[in-house]
Amino acid sequence: MAKKWLNKVKWDDNGLVPVIVQEVGSNDVLMFAFMNRDALQRTVELGEAVFWSRSRKRLWHKGEESGHVQKVHEIRLDCDEDVVLLKVTQIDSIACHTGRHSCFFQKFEGDVESGDWQTVEPVLKDPSSIYAAKP
């Protein structure tokens, strides 16, 4: 039987919905990803963020390799019902595969002619040590 709450979400033509992940407390935007129905259902069941990896074509439990799990406190649906917001606690403060707190670590500075993207957040942990080959 279809779950009514899942049917309320306006899934795109690929069966996906965009997801914004925001940290509880700081309100920092940590990352952007996609979910399919299974990912959203698993997120609710586990209380941890599960996404759909478009590159791997499979469910991706955030932190499955790095240990940087996202504990979900709240799930919201926007006014058009086509974007999901997760409010999370980010384990070990690292959300980005680059070893940074947020995936949004580049800030535009300057004007239209001479502007450029500047890195404004430090690497908290070397990614090679996060994703080192496991025995």
Swiss-Prot record:
Transmembrane segments: none annotated. Zn(2+) binds at C79, C96, C103. Keywords: Amino-acid biosynthesis, Cytoplasm, Histidine biosynthesis, Hydrolase, Magnesium, Metal-binding, Zinc. SUPFAM superfamilies: HisI-like. The keyword 4Fe-4S does not apply. It is found in: Cytoplasm. Belongs to the PRA-CH family. HAMAP family: HisI. Homodimer. This is Phosphoribosyl-AMP cyclohydrolase. The gene is hisI.
